A protein has these predicted regions:
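Short, conserved active-site loop motifs that form the nucleotide-linked donor/cofactor pocket
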Residues: 54, 89, 176
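Short, solvent-exposed loop/turn segments at secondary-structure junctions
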Residues: 28-31, 62-63, 96-98, 112-115, ...
Length: 185
């Protein structure tokens, strides 16, 4: 990982060498690095997925938590421009990071066969997500509260990031190097 996120040239070689079944990534404000995959690298990642027929699992819990400028489009959004790439992409999202950690509501957009298996696994693990939590989230979203909530949480996380970076500089100085996050937790 460098300043533009996952190094796709190196990934290409690793895929050839190891032939993975899937590649898991947090391309936007990745944890713990804070790196965001550039637009060019996102496109190349989708192209690699098609070339090697390997599933990309895009975990996108932080995509809406940018501090200033929005990040590049998600792999899911880009897949509309790269025919065939959706067949090799699973996109995971969550309300937990933006609304409430206890809410535990997320989603998966994936190829139909994978989605069917994921639904079965979910049912085996806990039967279903809390109906109350789902209804609460649906009501909140339908009422149009999300933009204000996002603005508030973005401001809080940006302030926390500034405090953390200042503390790292003051306490550790040149002994530590880090990427100044542009979003996320």
């Amino acid at each position: 990982i460098d300043a533009e996120g996952m190094q796709i040239d190196k990934l290409d070689q690793l895929i050839i060498e190891h032939r993975p079944k899937l590649i898991y990534t947090i391309p936007t404000f990745g944890n713990p690095s804070g790196a965001t995959l550039s637009l060019e690298r996102r496109q190349r990642l989708l192209e690699l997925a098609m070339r090697y027929q390997v599933l990309i699992v895009e975990d996108d819990p932080y995509g809406d938590l940018y501090f200033d400028a929005p990040p590049p489009p998600s792999l899911l959004a880009l897949s509309a421009q790269i025919p065939g790439s959706r067949d090799f992409l699973a996109h995971c999202g969550s309300l937990s990071k933006v609304l409430s950690p206890g809410l535990r509501i997320g989603w998966l957009i994936a190829p139909p066969a994978l989605l069917a298996k994921a639904v079965m696994c979910k049912q085996f693990s806990d039967a279903h997500t809390s109906t109350f939590a789902q209804a609460t989230a649906a009501h909140y979203l339908a009422a149009g509260h999300m933009p204000a909530a996002l603005a508030k949480v973005r401001k809080v996380y940006a302030q926390r990031a500034q405090v953390m970076m200042q503390a790292l500089r003051e306490e550790l100085g040149a002994a530590v190097a880090f990427t100044a996050p542009q979003g996320g937790l």
